[in-house]
Design a protein with these regions (language model features):
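A conserved acidic, glycine/proline-rich C-terminal tail/linker
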Residues: 74-80
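OB-fold (S1/OB) nucleic-acid-binding surfaces
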Residues: 1-4, 63-74
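Glycine/charge-rich catalytic "coupling/switch" loops of P-loop NTPases
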Residues: 2-60, 80-105
Length: 105
């Protein structure tokens, strides 16, 4: 599983980032867009494939929990009426600017 994060040069320097270094990547669930598997993710965003494990329907958006093919659990949101169902294939996308990095020891 790979992802991209957009950070400033100053942040990279302060963190002391090095190639191959272990990092923790975080984002809020509100930054995760869930979409039907057949849709194409926008260019310039991180995206992963998985399967819906839980779906909480709402009046404007549905909360979608998914098990990614890489084994990671993620939660995001889809517009109401997206057609997603529990056990359906899904794509999740996160903009590079929404990913926060932390050092992992």
């Amino acid at each position: 599983m790979s992802l991209a994060s957009r950070i400033t040069a100053e942040s990279a320097e302060l963190l002391g980032l090095q190639p191959g270094q272990a990092l923790l990547a975080l984002c809020k669930a509100t930054a995760v867009r869930a979409m039907p598997y057949a849709e194409s993710p926008a260019a310039g965003v991180n995206w992963w494939e998985g399967r819906v494990t839980r779906l909480s329907r709402g009046p404007e958006v549905d909360e979608v929990a998914a098990q990614l093919d890489a084994g990671v659990q993620m939660v995001g949101f889809a517009p109401t009426g997206s057609g997603l169902r529990v056990r359906s294939r899904v794509k999740l996308q996160v903009d590079e600017s929404a990913v926060v990095l932390a050092l992992w020891d």
